[in-house]
Curated annotation (Swiss-Prot):
It comes from the Bacteria. The keyword Transferase applies. NCBIfam families: PduO_Nterm. The N-terminus (PduON, residues 1-185) has adenosyltransferase activity in vivo and in vitro; it partially complements a deletion mutant for growth on 1,2-PD. The C-terminal domain (PduOC, residues 194-336) is required for full complemention of a pduO deletion. Keywords: ATP-binding, Bacterial microcompartment, Cobalamin biosynthesis, Heme, Iron, Magnesium, Metal-binding, Nucleotide-binding, Transferase. The gene is pduO. Its EC number is 2.5.1.-. It is found in: Bacterial microcompartment. This is Corrinoid adenosyltransferase PduO. Disruption phenotype: Decreased growth on 1,2-PD cyanocobalamin medium; no growth is seen in a double cobA-pduO deletion. Belongs to the Cob(I)alamin adenosyltransferase family. PduO subfamily. It comes from Salmonella typhimurium (strain LT2 / SGSC1412 / ATCC 700720). The lineage of its organism: Bacteria, Pseudomonadati, Pseudomonadota, Gammaproteobacteria, Enterobacterales.
Length: 336
């Protein structure tokens, strides 16, 4: 079956109602841009990780067919055989916007359009929706355009922005979980060649670490909380000196756990959680369990992670000083 008619070779096209107009007519520009947008939404639906987003995008694509058909008709009389955009579709877009934006953190500056493939495609589709809106405004200066169509296309670009933010947030959270899991699993699986080496923190190690930390804290006249976890992040010792801040009882174990989970000192995480860095959002995604300022150290022996030490109560520099002094008292290192 031939798909060509040759009737458009002279630069004109036929509307649904039979009139022939130039292919540069504002009406053709408007529904032609909607066609571009519809094609872009197919790419978005293929890339979206969220099943609800895919379902919504496919529904929007069907609605754009109705939208285009209405623009491609010169008649203002509704056809009983045709579907039309209504307030119901606008309400569905607004509900989708609210759901998506409830899942993401507020922004206080401009962002690059998309850090994952799905978000990038959605942002691109958003720009096409904006262009379609401009074409529709231009068309409305020449012919009657239902106000509900103007509202729909305006809301659609907002919806695509919200979906892009949600896809970005989900992808970033998944990356963080993968990275943390990778580091944690690596810490829990020592090389086979080291299996017979006594690598766990002994009672003597725990005693020496705690004693050395307390003695250094007393020298600095800083009451602190000392917390030690094993290689699995399980708390083994926590000692609170008299007059130590109550919040330190929360922070010291978190510092020790973070050091084991991330296999690094907590102060070394500061740069990688900044906006735009690989682990940006790590603290919020793990509900505050991760600490990214000084005072937590991973404890290594013979290249194997054996535990973590967390100190809290003084300034960041004092906490790090106390931890380093305690670590020096036993046969462990702070890096693999």
């Amino acid at each position: 079956m031939a798909i060509y008619t040759r009737t458009g070779d002279a630069g004109t096209t036929s509307l649904f109602t039979g009139q022939r107009v130039s292919k540069t007519h504002p009406r053709v520009e408007a529904y032609g841009t909607l066609d571009e947008l519809n094609a872009a939404l197919s790419l978005c639906a293929c890339a979206a990780a969220d099943e609800n987003h895919r379902t919504l995008l496919e529904a929007i694509q069907q609605q754009l067919f109705w939208f285009s058909a209405e623009l491609a008709s010169d008649s203002e009389q509704p056809s009983p055989k045709q579907r039309y955009i209504s307030s119901e579709e606008i309400s569905a877009l607004e509900a989708a916007i609210d759901r998506a934006m409830a899942r993401v953190e507020p922004l206080h500056s401009f962002i690059l359009p998309g850090r994952c493939e799905a978000a990038s495609r959605l942002h691109f589709a958003r720009t096409l929706a904006r262009r379609a809106e401009r074409r529709l405004v231009e068309l409305a200066t020449e012919v009657n355009v239902r106000q509900v169509l103007m509202r729909y296309i305006n809301r659609l670009s907002d919806c695509l922005y919200a979906l892009a933010r949600a896809e970005d947030s989900d992808a970033h959270q998944a990356n963080i979980i993968r990275e943390v899991s990778k580091r944690y699993l690596a810490a829990c699986q020592p090389p086979h060649s080291k299996e017979t080496t006594p690598v766990a923190l002994s009672f003597h190690d725990l005693h020496q670490l705690t004693r050395a930390a307390v003695e250094r804290a007393q020298q600095l006249q800083v009451p602190v909380v000392v917390s030690i976890v094993d290689a699995h992040g399980t708390e083994t010792v926590t000692w609170r000196m008299p007059d130590a801040l109550l919040v330190s009882s929360e922070l010291a174990p978190k510092k020790a756990w973070t050091a084991v989970a991330m296999k690094t000192a907590t102060h070394e995480l500061s740069d990688v959680v900044q906006p735009g860095a690989a682990l940006y959002g790590l603290e919020s995604h793990l509900q505050g369990k991760v600490v990214t300022f000084g005072g937590g150290y991973a404890l290594w022996r013979d290249g194997i992670l054996i535990g973590g030490l967390g100190i809290s109560g003084g300034s960041v520099e004092q906490d790090m000083d106390i931890a380093q002094t305690a670590i020096a008292a036993i046969n462990v290192g702070t890096h693999q």
